[in-house]
């Protein structure tokens, strides 16, 4: 664990880490931390850090990163991190060398979180709860209880509200109709729950990030009801 460091440059290597470590950075400020090539960590977690840059040049075997309670931090990713969990963060920059190393970002209370991909600039985008609230004020999104999932869908970064069916199965409104037809994993066994979920949904959010230019993004917001009428 790297804890309560301030203004330091640190390199984590196989010489100063145990085999298969769980690498945790906690309460670090104004630091630059490099996870060197050759390091194979089980998991990477960053908690309560500020103005700190973490460069992942090694590997995370679970391909999972957790970031929570961080402000103005940057994570540079040079190996597969397929799943990112972001909670209660402000101004977080997730910078991937390759878009293929990313699959999804799960977020709650995420403000000004950017996702960039050096080899696919058109896939860049942001997750910002403040923007979502402003664009859809009637939804009453909560930083504590509402969770979103961000993925690449049809060539763009798509952020959707996660909903749960009556059996607590997590999904999105876009995927519920597909599940009701049995076209996704465990779909046939979940048909009754999907129909119930469709009648009970109170929130509908679909946010598509499309490139406006190399220097900015245009956020196109559609309510699911409006999309269905288009």
Residue spans for each PLM region:
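Feature marks extracellular polysaccharide-active and adherence modules
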Residues: 26, 34-38, 47, 55-57, ...
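The right-handed parallel beta-helix/beta-solenoid scaffold, focusing on the short coil/turn
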Residues: 8-10, 21-23, 29-31, 42-44, ...
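Eukaryotic beta-rich interaction modules
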Residues: 3-18, 26-28, 35-38
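Short, polar loop motifs at secondary-structure junctions
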Residues: 60
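Intrinsically disordered, low-complexity terminal regions
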Residues: 1-14, 83-230
């Amino acid at each position: 664990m790297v804890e309560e460091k301030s203004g330091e440059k640190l390199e984590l290597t196989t010489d100063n880490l145990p085999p298969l470590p769980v690498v945790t950075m906690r309460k670090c400020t104004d630091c630059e931390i490099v996870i060197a090539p050759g390091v194979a960590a089980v998991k990477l977690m960053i908690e309560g850090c500020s103005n700190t840059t973490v460069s992942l040049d090694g590997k995370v075997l679970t391909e999972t990163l957790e970031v929570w309670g961080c402000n103005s931090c940057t994570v540079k990713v040079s190996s597969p991190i397929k799943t990112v969990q972001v909670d209660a963060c402000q101004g977080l920059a997730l910078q991937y060398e390759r878009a293929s190393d990313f699959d999804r970002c799960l977020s709650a209370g995420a403000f000004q979180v950017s996702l960039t991909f050096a080899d696919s600039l058109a896939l860049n985008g942001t997750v910002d709860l403040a923007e979502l609230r402003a664009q859809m004020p009637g939804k009453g999104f909560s930083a504590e209880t509402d969770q979103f999932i961000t993925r690449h869908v049809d060539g763009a970064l798509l952020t959707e509200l996660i909903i749960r069916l009556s059996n607590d199965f997590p999904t999105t409104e876009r995927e519920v109709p597909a599940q009701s037809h049995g076209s996704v994993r465990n779909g046939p066994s979940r048909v009754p729950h999907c129909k119930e979920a469709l009648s009970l949904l109170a929130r509908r959010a679909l946010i598509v990030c499309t490139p406006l230019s190399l220097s900015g993004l245009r956020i196109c917001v559609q309510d699911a009801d409006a999309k269905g009428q288009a």
